[in-house]
Amino acid sequence: LGAALSFEGRSSNVRSIGEPTLEKSIKGAKDSFVETLRTNTALVRRRICTPKLKVVENAVGRKSHTNVAVMFIDGVVDPALVEETCRRLDALDVDALVSTGTFEEYIVDKSLSPFPQLLHTERPDRFAAYLLEGRVGILADGLPVGLVLPVTFAEFMRVGDDRANHFSYAAVLTLLRYLALFIALYLPALYVAVALYHQEMIPTG
C-alpha cells in the first residue's frame, strides 16, 4: 500500500472519576473532578453542549509548565473579565503550580483579604452552573478542583444541591444558614455583655 499508520497505545495511571468527597450530593450528580485536565474539561462539555463554550489554554510555571484552561461561555460572560483573567494568568511568575493556593496568592485583587475571592468546587455540575451565570472557570492539570470567579460572600452560603431542589425550598435552607451565622456571631457576644455588665437582666427567681 505504501502507507503506514501510527498511533499511541500506552495507558496512563490516572484516577478514575468518582463521587465528591467534600461536596456530597444527595439529589445532584455523583461525579467529581480528577487530576487530569482533559477529563475535567470533558465533564464540563458533557453538561454544556454548545459551541459557545470556549476554552483558552495556557502553560503556567517556569519549570512545571502546567496546563491551565480558562473556560467561559461566549456571549454570556463579560469579555473584559475573560481578558483580565487571561492577563493575570500570563503574568503568573512561579516555578511550579502545585496547589490552588498559587491562584489565591497571585491572581486575586487582595491576597491579604480574610474573605476568599475564588470559589473552589470539585463538582462539574456546580462548575458548569456558574459558567452559565456568566462567570469564568479555571481548571489546571494535576488539581482535582475547579476555580470560579468572581464570587461574592453569598455564593459561600449556597451548596451544590440547592440547584437540585425547588427554589422555595432552597431559599428556606439558605435563610436558615444566614440565621445560623447570625446566631454564631452575635449570641456569644450578647451573653458575655449580659453576664458581665447587665446582670440585672438575668432572672434569678
Predicted regions located by residue number:
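Cytosolic regulatory modules rich in charged/polar residues
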Residues: 1-205
